[in-house]
Amino acid sequence: MGAARIAPGLALLLCCPVLSSAYALVDADDVMTKEEQIFLLHRAQAQCEKRLKEVLQRPADIMESDKGWASAPTSGKPRKEKASGKLYPESGEDTGSRHQGRPCLPEWDHILCWPLGAPGEVVAMPCPDYIYDFNHKGHAYRRCDRNGSWELVPGHNRTWANYSECVKFLTNETREREVFDRLGMIYTVGYSVSLASLTVAVLILAYFRRLHCTRNYIHMHLFLSFMLRAVSIFVKDAVLYSGATLDEAERLTEEELRAIAQAPLPPVAATSYVGCRVAVTFFLYFLATNYYWILVEGLYLHSLIFMAFFSEKKYLWGFTVFGWGLPAIFVAVWVSVRATLANTGCWDLSSGNKKWIIQVPILASIVLNFILFINIVRVLATKLRETNAGRCDTRQQYRKLLKSTLVLMPLFGVHYIVFMATPYTEVSGTLWQVQMHYEMLFNSFQGFFVAIIYCFCNGEVQAEIKKSWSRWTLALDFKRKARSGSSSYSYGPMVSHTSVTNVGPRTGLGLPLSPRLLPAATTNGHPQLPCHTKPETPALQTTPPVVAAPKDDGFLNGSCSGLDEEASAPERPSVLLQEEWETVM
């Protein structure tokens, strides 16, 4: 079995869930603030009061026969209708018996809209879904006495209601809080580590001119998109969580929820939500640009492999516009639609189908990048089979293919597709916890992995750092010896007994000499320096040594110094393609 047979199987295994789950959510980050919770409560109150007005205006005989407001007794087996959330008795039960006497009138208790209550029965209503932290599988209960009045709490002038099933998440939240605290710690540490490592990587690639080429420019854009994504997440969290949010709401009791709901709806000022809306907008934009620069990396590598003639400088501008400009278009469309049709809160909650304006382009980039990844892995497997034809060691082929695949996975964001087919479920579910831990871990540390693989582990980067370190240590050693006035000075590990005063301006002072390049041979008692000529001339003739970059398995393999120079059309793609093969082989 050849190594090339792995690619079709891998494509069949992974493409099916990707293509069949384009409806899945991407980086759902709904944050419920206290102000938004109050808004939802008041909206539910307005809807309830409208319905109450319609019902109370009907004649008494219509009210008593209206099953839409009738509630079932606890003695019968209830049947819940999901559309309306009301309970009806099973067929065969005497529905007329529960209307004997005066029914309890429907009302709004600042939490729930209660229907007509049958005298002497307990009314059960599903916990409202507009209370974010309620247990939406539970029920709230009220009792209607035989006089047609809602039962009061003994010794208190208020209506009795049992919300214990609804508030169980509020009173028994230790496990859930531990999960959220752990997830918050994971992504905070991950994005912090990624931000620090990516900052160093960008500074390295920008500082060394020999590393300036199209490939590294694209890497720098990708690194910058990861950095801006991390910063935008920190800013968004600081803005949204600066006031009273769910941390406070989770500790609220039923009475405190009532007090919040009874408060008048605060006036919505145009400037009250500007800060959080700007933070959410920039977060969504930088999130989208990060996905699209990952796609740009895939398109660039795919173009080098499959395009015979590829102008890097020309396509660099196109990639730049694609990576930064295209996300700005659909994010601007989303902002316009949200401001026009759903201008409520901080825009952090998904407003129906409007979320697809941003999520569909992101999902498309993930699917397209995964297809490019599968195609490149297929070509790698084919090349491995051709180069190792006639050899019996298939395990080495598999190891090379696995290594190449693992190197490409962070660059192509392959981990995004693992849970694409899995919808978000209950917080207490095991699958949800596994999914969130996986996503928080890999999404936050992806920038760190990319910086390690494509910068710090790159041979050319390491060579440039070693050269710079050698220059700095050599210059420092000369300065130290010059200040001390010693009769000896060192070139790296070797010591010359020539007086410092005999070192002229042409003796190579401060040249980028690497200690490992200095041979131990001596001439006339002096060490033989690189490019040193025998003294037919009175002064040493030295030239800066050229340090060859070691062969590297990283994506940055090969010197950038010759990549952007003019070359003939047939020669240029072959050189680039060979470098990319050495990247992943």
From Swiss-Prot:
Extracellular topological domain residue ranges: 27-184, 236-277, 338-356, 424-435
Tree of life domain: Eukaryota
GO molecular function list: parathyroid hormone receptor activity; peptide hormone binding; protein homodimerization activity
GO CC annotations, alphabetized: plasma membrane
Location(s) in or outside the cell: Cell membrane
Region forming the signal peptide: 1-26
Principal cellular location given in the protein's record: membrane
Motif (Important for interaction with G proteins): 469-472
Membrane spanning residue stretches: 185-208, 216-235, 278-301, 316-337, 357-377, 405-423, 436-458
Pfam families: 7tm_2, HRM
BP GO annotations: adenylate cyclase-activating G protein-coupled receptor signaling pathway; adenylate cyclase-modulating G protein-coupled receptor signaling pathway; cell surface receptor signaling pathway
Record InterPro entries: GPCR_2, GPCR_2-like_7TM, GPCR_2_extracell_dom_sf, GPCR_2_extracellular_dom, GPCR_2_parathyroid_rcpt, GPCR_2_secretin-like, GPCR_2_secretin-like_CS
Gene3D superfamilies linked to this entry: GPCR, family 2, extracellular hormone receptor domain (4.10.1240.10), Rhodopsin 7-helix transmembrane proteins (1.20.1070.10)
Renumbered residue ranges of the record's region Disordered: 66-100
Keywords assigned: Cell membrane, Disulfide bond, G-protein coupled receptor, Glycoprotein, Membrane, Phosphoprotein, Receptor, Signal, Transducer, Transmembrane, Transmembrane helix
Modified residues (Phosphothreonine): T543
SMART domains, per database record: HormR (SM00008)
Disulfide bonds: C48-C113, C104-C144, C127-C166
KW Ribonucleoprotein (keyword) present: no
Protein family per UniProt: Belongs to the G-protein coupled receptor 2 family.
Complex and partners: Homodimer in the absence of bound ligand. Peptide hormone binding leads to dissociation of the homodimer.
Function: G-protein-coupled receptor for parathyroid hormone (PTH) and for parathyroid hormone-related peptide (PTHLH). Ligand binding causes a conformation change that triggers signaling via guanine nucleotide-binding proteins (G proteins) and modulates the activity of downstream effectors, such as adenylate cyclase (cAMP). PTH1R is coupled to G(s) G alpha proteins and mediates activation of adenylate cyclase activity. PTHLH dissociates from PTH1R more rapidly than PTH; as consequence, the cAMP response induced by PTHLH decays faster than the response induced by PTH.
Protein known as: Parathyroid hormone/parathyroid hormone-related peptide receptor
Lineage: Eukaryota, Metazoa, Chordata, Craniata, Vertebrata
